[in-house]
Amino acid sequence: MPSSPSSLTDPGTVDIRWARVDDAEALATLLCAMAAHYRQTLLDHSRAAATARQWLSDESPAYPHFALAFVGGEVAGLASVAIAHPGIDLERLMFLKDLFVHDGARDKGVGRALVGFLAGYCLGKGIGRIDLTTEDWNEGALRFYDRLGAERHGQKVFLRLPGDALKRIART
């Protein structure tokens, strides 16, 4: 299992790149840390690694799904994204599903570097914006996105169709 930073006193350079198949272990390490951070059911690392390996190899998307941040060769953060074609304004958007920085790498510029990497990708591909959500209780994340210039859109409501709803809808 790749190590994750317990504490970064001098983060040095933050290296960001799109995840590759050989990053499955690093991605799994962050997914497990993210589940613990958000007080979700803890993930089994080997299962997370197998799933990450599948995501990074078999699905072969038209765009990358995960950006990973490394500091001193250690995995420090991730961004999980999807590209959407909304239609109404004929402009593609990137949806930032998750931005997670390992506890020991927080407040070291890793999150900013990840979002900067995504912004550069968007500009290079003609993608007009990044949409994202965060928990309303996550004051640190809200301050972070405010500092980046993110606009809050109160007219939007976040909804989810969980597994049971999917099954019910699919049967009708």
Q: At which residue positions do the language-model features occur?
A:
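Helix-loop element at the rim of GNAT/NAT acetyltransferase active sites that forms part
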Residues: 29-43, 87
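A short beta-loop-alpha structural element at the N-terminal edge
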Residues: 15-29, 40
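Conserved active-site alpha-helix within GNAT-family acetyltransferase domains
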Residues: 112, 116, 136-155
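Active-site rim helix/loop that mediates acceptor-substrate recognition in acyltransferases
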Residues: 44-66
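Conserved acyl-CoA
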Residues: 102, 113-129, 151
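Active-site acidic-Proline motif in GNAT/NAT acetyltransferases
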Residues: 102-104, 108, 136-137
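Conserved beta-strand-loop-alpha-helix junction that forms the acyl-donor binding cleft
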Residues: 132-141, 160-163
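Conserved beta-strand in the GNAT
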Residues: 68, 74-83, 95, 100
